[in-house]
Amino acid sequence: MKLVLNQVSKKFDDKVILNEVNHTFEMGKIYGLLGKNGAGKTTLFNCVSQNLMVDGGQITLDDRLDYRDTQIGYVYATPRLPAFMTGYEFIKYFIEIHADEISEAKDPSDYLTLIGIEEADHHALIRDYSHGMQNKVQMLTSLITAPPVLLLDEPLTSFDVVAAHEMKKILLSIKPETIIIFSTHILSLAQDLCDEIVLLHHGDLRSIDASDFQSPDFEEQLIKILSDQAEGSEL
């Protein structure tokens, strides 16, 4: 399965966010989307998830322009969860309304334990969860339905070291059957986890293969590109 961006454009008023960008994202790979604040990473995710219409070009999934019937997993930077429910209640409800998309559902407690939520917190209100715990629950919903495309907006940044390590293992385990794209400001995370880094800069997408990650001046060259100081960079 492939997610293809073909001459995709998006702007708000006179500000161009995506300028006829082209890129192909393939199943079985993890992509890191890097860019400065305000570069348009969230806008790109919203276009892919069809929360926003593009102004030009097209986005296709598995050669289909209309893929609204395909589940797109989207983990937002700010969790969007019902604060009045407990973690257990929410996951139970989520499983019930997505029953036709889940092949072998587990007990909600099993899922919560999987992502490192302590048993004592399973029946606590979500509003009392830390930001990191809420992010775990939000990511869990995408793992339960196993969507073919998973968009992660600044994942792992609110997790502690142990939780981040566990989430990395989970992402690697679902990688063969998933197109995973995550935005991040943490270069070391992208280098550690990704098969390819995609830079979003001045409305354009630029791909960097994993083979370049270990270059001794990789980080320096990347910063130069994003700060418009690069001249003849080989990245």
List where the protein language model places each region:
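The feature captures the beta-strand-to-loop junction immediately N-terminal to the Walker
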Residues: Y31-K36
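Conserved structural motif at the start of ABC-family nucleotide-binding domains
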Residues: L3-L5, L18-E20
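Conserved beta-strand-loop-alpha-helix hinge in the C-terminal portion
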Residues: D204-S227
